Amino acid sequence: MSARVRSRSRGRGDGQEAPDVVAFVAPGESQQEEPPTDNQDIEPGQEREGTPPIEERKVEGDCQEMDLEKTRSERGDGSDVKEKTPPNPKHAKTKEAGDGQP
């Protein structure tokens, strides 16, 4: 029987050398074993025991409604939106060191 040997020697990053790590792995074994999954073929419309049914929604209609809502609110075209002009930076006062409150 032959075994694979894995070794690793890398620095820690703090100036100290890490000790060599040697792991023996038998053929056919992996270091990370995953539990077997239940692969049952379930047809659409069928429910698994203990799980709530999935609610199917009409995607196209929902997306179209969301797009309309976005365009209405993003541009600010509504009658309740008032135009505001940003202040002119030339007339703004700049505080110098020591001015103002501590």
From Swiss-Prot:
InterPro entries: GAGE (IPR031320), GAGE_fam (IPR008625). Its main location: cytoplasm. Residues 1-10 have a biased composition (Basic residues). GO terms for cellular component: cytoplasm; mitochondrion; nucleus. Expressed at basal lvels in the adult normal prostate gland but is highly up-regulated in the fetal prostate and prostate cancer cells. Preferentially expressed in normal male and female reproductive tissues, testis, fallopian tube, uterus, and placenta, as well as in testicular cancer, uterine cancer, cervical cancer and kidney cancer. HIPK1-mediated phosphorylation at Thr-51 leads to the compaction of its intrinsically disordered conformation and is critical for its ability to potentiate the transcriptional activator activity of JUN inspite of a reduced interaction with JUN. CLK2-mediated phosphorylation at multiple Ser and Thr residues attenuates its ability to potentiate JUN transcriptional activator activity. The modification Phosphothreonine is found at residues 51, 71, 85, 94. Keywords: Activator, Cytoplasm, DNA-binding, Mitochondrion, Nucleus, Phosphoprotein, Transcription, Transcription regulation. Changing residue 51 to A: Loss of phosphorylation and its ability to potentiate JUN transcriptional activator activity. Induction: Up-regulated in response to a variety of stress factors. It is found in: Cytoplasm; Nucleus; Mitochondrion. Interacts with JUN. Intrinsically disordered protein that potentiates the transcriptional activator activity of JUN. Protects cells from stress-induced apoptosis by inhibiting reactive oxygen species (ROS) production and via regulation of the MAPK signaling pathway. This is P antigen family member 4.
